[in-house]
């Protein structure tokens, strides 16, 4: 069938891939706080975004400034935010040149036997077109 030849290009660790420390932590947190949560890529995305928000708040606390401006300054100062392999490390900054998005991708095959119905074929990689792009 056609679905056996379909690929999806996205980002992120495969649900259940505990070789990624971030996924191992996500699964522990799901077991502890939301044991009925079904495997879901959108849940994983939200969890990852919460980790970024946590990094912003932690930086603002270390700067002793939880004001709106303090949170924004904390965001602009974040570099190499490690998400434990859920996504590649993220960089933020105060200028477009510093806010270069991740260029990594993962190719997945449709696989209904997997928790989120996709199977990682490639691991994180950056294609030549993405490497050459300028922002």
What is each PLM-predicted segment?
Residues 36-43, 54-117:
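Segments of small-molecule ligand-sensing domains
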Residues 50:
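C-terminal helical cap and adjacent loop that interface with cofactors, partners, or active-site loops
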Residues 121-135:
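Short, cationic low-complexity segments
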């Amino acid at each position: 069938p056609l679905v056996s030849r379909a690929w999806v290009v996205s980002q992120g660790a495969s649900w259940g891939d505990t070789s990624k420390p971030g996924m191992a932590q996500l699964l522990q947190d799901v077991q502890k706080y939301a044991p009925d949560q079904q495997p879901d890529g959108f849940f994983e995305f939200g969890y990852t975004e919460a980790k970024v928000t946590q990094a912003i708040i932690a930086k603002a606390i270390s700067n002793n400034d939880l004001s709106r401006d303090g949170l924004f300054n904390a965001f602009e100062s974040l570099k190499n935010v490690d998400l434990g392999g859920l996504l590649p490390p993220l960089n933020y900054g105060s200028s477009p040149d510093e806010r270069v998005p991740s260029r990594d991708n993962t190719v997945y095959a449709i696989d209904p036997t997997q928790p989120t119905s996709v199977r990682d074929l490639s691991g994180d990689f950056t294609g030549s077109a993405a490497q050459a792009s300028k922002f």
